[in-house]
């Protein structure tokens, strides 16, 4: 499974010199687009495809992702979560599950400085074939496979400081069905995290609101110091997605439900 914010490649216009100098790569867009681009329905194109294209052309996060060479607008969600919760630090070991097309992996590489000597280590893993990201070990493998945790620890030379998951199954339009499918991925990602996280580690995962997340949160509270929920500004309006941030991993020996829920 891959990040829900579609296969957008890097590139795009360079923008003006003043604009380029006023922002660092990885910063969120400021302001809004002045002109609205309206797309006509072409012959053979479905109305839903036209609406999607029009939304993309008028989305400041899509435009800014292209300008900065980021592979998806979803990268800004991780940027905003990191700025709020201080998730990524130089030298950290990070795994990005469902990494394709690589937007979150790009941000993890930059903020852990994995391209630098003595920097961090980043592994991106996805069941789909995907283009690698410089500074990361990019694996095409199903993280639900029994051998995946051992494979990851081998690539990391040890346990992990942060597990990221922006995975979402293709939506059906039926809210409860979509909720259950995303929660299945979230639960699988958490069970994977239990096997690879180092003490004190953290976990970030997308869920869809829908009422069945209680059992997972209860389990997480037994193993982490604090659980938070957040909806970053880059999440689209009307989207049911929210992110669970678990910090202070204690492991399977955590015992009773002592974690704080600071939603």
From Swiss-Prot:
Q: Where is this region: Disordered?
A: 1-34
Catalytic activity field: uridine(2552) in 23S rRNA + S-adenosyl-L-methionine = 2'-O-methyluridine(2552) in 23S rRNA + S-adenosyl-L-homocysteine + H(+)
Give a Gene Ontology cellular component term annotated to this protein. Answer: cytoplasm
Q: Which UniProt keywords apply?
A: Cytoplasm, Methyltransferase, rRNA processing, S-adenosyl-L-methionine, Transferase
List the GO molecular function terms.
rRNA (uridine-2'-O-)-methyltransferase activity
Where would you find this protein in the cell?
Answer: Cytoplasm
Q: What is its EC number?
A: 2.1.1.166
Please list the residues that bind S-adenosyl-L-methionine: 102, 104, 126, 142, 166
Q: Could you name the active-site residues?
A: 206 (proton acceptor)
Annotated function? Specifically methylates the uridine in position 2552 of 23S rRNA at the 2'-O position of the ribose in the fully assembled 50S ribosomal subunit.
Q: Which family does it belong to?
A: Belongs to the class I-like SAM-binding methyltransferase superfamily. RNA methyltransferase RlmE family.
Kindly provide the name given to this protein in its UniProt entry.
Ribosomal RNA large subunit methyltransferase E
């Amino acid at each position: 499974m891959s990040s829900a914010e579609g296969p957008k490649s890097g590139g795009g216009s360079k923008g003006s010199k003043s604009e380029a100098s006023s922002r660092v790569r990885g910063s969120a867009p400021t302001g809004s687009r002045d002109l609205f681009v309206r797309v006509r329905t072409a012959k053979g194109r479905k109305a839903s495809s036209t609406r999607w294209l029009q939304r993309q052309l008028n989305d400041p996060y899509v435009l800014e992702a292209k300008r900065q060479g980021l592979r998806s607008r979803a990268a800004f969600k991780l940027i905003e979560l990191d700025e709020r919760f201080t998730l990524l630090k130089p030298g950290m070991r990070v795994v990005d599950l469902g990494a394709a097309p690589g937007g979150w992996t790009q941000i993890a590489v930059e903020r852990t400085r994995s391209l630098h000597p003595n920097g961090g280590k980043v592994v991106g893993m996805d069941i789909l074939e995907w283009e690698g990201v410089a500074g990361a070990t990019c694996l095409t493998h199903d993280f639900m496979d029994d051998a995946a945790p051992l494979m990851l620890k081998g690539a990391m030379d040890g346990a992990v400081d942060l597990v990221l998951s922006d995975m979402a199954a293709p939506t059906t339009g039926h809210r409860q069905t979509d909720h259950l499918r995303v929660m299945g991925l979230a639960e699988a990602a958490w069970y994977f995290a239990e096997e690879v996280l180092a003490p004190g580690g953290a976990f970030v995962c997308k869920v869809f609101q829908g009422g069945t997340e209680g059992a997972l949160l209860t389990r997480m509270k037994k193993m982490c110091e604090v659980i938070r929920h957040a909806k970053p500004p880059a999440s689209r309006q009307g989207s049911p997605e929210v992110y669970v941030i678990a910090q202070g991993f204690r492991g399977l020996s955590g015992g009773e439900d002592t974690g704080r829920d600071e939603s």
